[in-house]
């Protein structure tokens, strides 16, 4: 246990140094978006092939929803940017879909197609929400565009069981001006919503959306995306 905690502390220290050295440089870029959104979803041992597919198809369908397409065009810049991260253990995170600027139905359909065809790239492992947040924050530290708001959207069905303490990772990321939201998939841990609310989310307007199970994920992610996009464009 002591060795694991030492490793977790070292991982957090490395991540903080990386974030400190990567201040956003996006103001120099030509493209500005209303929100830069990292969709980070769980590929740990508890997520089987069917459950992975329900997450993938649920996110893809959401970006075809007319209400979401209208919302993402409603801000001052008329566009948002999205990237998709798959994660499991503290050393397993990967960008499954790179940054994609979405400014209307054509770009939204292209993103939906990319997500809908996205293979499972992250191998199963333990559940390190903290490492996933730190990794996602690194993607937001120096994106190829300027963003009025930066958000990490974490979907999971479990609690943090590897890597840095979740509250420490959350606090470090929020201190960089990043909002962390959660989607609790309540098929295994019945108190997950409260756990994420107390330990993971943070930043202006942070919230947790709940899916009753993986079959309910599509409904929940649609509501969650609307809640994230509309405040940014309002």
Regions found by a protein language model. Give the residues of each.
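Von Willebrand factor A/integrin I-like adhesion domains
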Residues: 188-233
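Von Willebrand factor
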Residues: 31-98, 102, 106-149, 151-155, 182-192, ...
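Short beta-strand-loop
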Residues: 75-115, 192-199
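VWA/integrin I-like adhesion module and closely mimicked acidic/polar interface patches used
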Residues: 72, 158-199
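Exposed acidic/Ser/Thr-rich ligand/metal-binding surfaces
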Residues: 120, 124-176, 226, 230, ...
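Second-shell loop/turn segments in exported
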Residues: 40-50, 82, 98-101, 115-126, ...
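Bacterial N-terminal signal peptides
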Residues: 9-20
């Amino acid at each position: 246990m002591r060795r694991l905690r030492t490793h977790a502390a070292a991982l957090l220290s490395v991540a903080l140094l990386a974030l400190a050295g990567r201040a956003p440089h996006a103001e120099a870029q030509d493209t500005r978006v209303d929100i830069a959104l990292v969709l980070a979803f769980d590929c740990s041992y508890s997520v089987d092939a069917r459950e992975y597919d329900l997450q993938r198809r649920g996110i893809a369908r959401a970006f075809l929803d007319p209400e979401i397409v209208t919302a993402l065009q409603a801000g001052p810049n008329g566009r948002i940017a999205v990237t998709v991260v798959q994660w499991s253990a503290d050393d397993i995170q990967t960008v499954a879909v790179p940054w994609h600027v979405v400014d209307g139905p054509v770009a939204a359909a292209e993103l939906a197609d990319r997500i809908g065809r996205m293979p499972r790239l992250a191998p199963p492992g333990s559940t390190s929400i903290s490492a996933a947040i730190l990794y996602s924050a690194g993607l937001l530290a120096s994106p190829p565009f300027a963003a009025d708001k930066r958000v990490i959207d974490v979907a999971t069905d479990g609690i943090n069981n590897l890597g840095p303490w979740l509250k420490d990772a959350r606090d470090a990321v929020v201190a960089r001006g990043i909002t962390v939201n959660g989607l609790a998939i309540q098929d295994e841990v019945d108190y997950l919503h409260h756990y994420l609310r107390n330990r993971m989310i943070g930043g202006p307007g942070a919230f947790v959306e709940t899916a009753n199970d993986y079959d309910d994920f599509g409904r929940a992610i649609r509501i969650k995306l609307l809640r994230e996009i509309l405040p940014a464009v309002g």
